[in-house]
Amino acid sequence: VYDLKLSKFREGLPEDYISLSTNMDYIPYDDKNSEHVRIKKEIDDFMYKLFPEDDLRKYMWEHAASSLSGLNINQKFNIYTGGGANGKSKFVNLLSKALGTYADTLDIGVVTHKRSGPGRPMPEITKLPGKRYICMDESTKGDILNEGIIKQFTGGDKVEARGMYNSKMTQFTPQFEFVHTTNNLPEIKSRDHGTWRRIRQVPFKTKFVDANEVPANNIDPHSGNKVYMKDTTIDEKIDIWAPVFMALLIDIFKKTKGKVNDCDIVMEATNKYRYKQDILGNFICEMIENT
């Protein structure tokens, strides 16, 4: 067991009540170990290509490290956005591989439909206790987020649900970083601060293409974004990277204690997202002048 409070690796104790596992050994990062150095260099290159801007890359390292704590101190719902072939799923795969059974997925329908009636079974929710990283896949155009459920999962309050064919209710406090990967941003009808202070849109702007499609300067002439050759061995590399990646996240957590500092790129994307959702506000700003 790696004890985040004590910042040390120790023997597990019965009172830890641990039933989840990363499914790999903890190996501290050693900058004198040539294999560790080589793998770290590959991970750094991967992160640099995904997030060329220093501030955004720092945000994503802190975001990934915050998933270790289970404290949910940031109370955020991160939405990873961008067109296809931009590395969203590979980032999710790397973090999920490092976290083992602490990571899981959730159907987007859980947060786009109205809440189930009291006492109705919600087996999707009963698998979430103890999880540290929950990712929802693609939403479809026109999907509307139920902001009440988003607040419930990110607010630190207890959640109650019942499994299928089970009369007993499961009650727990969500401990996970809650994220959504999508090419189509879902609609958010709410305008209140309590909803939007939780939303963070993370743009994945880099594109990974076949070798014959890479521009000479690695810049897309239309978007101005970075373009790199896709790595067909990335899935095998992720399996190798995971232990070192976890060690790096623990080192970051020691410094941040799970706090994620906002960055201008994420906030700019989020504010544009919010602005587009406010149709009435857009009309007032564009069509009405003070006299």
Label each region the model flagged.
Residues 1-291:
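Feature primarily recognizes SF3-like P-loop helicase cores of small DNA viruses
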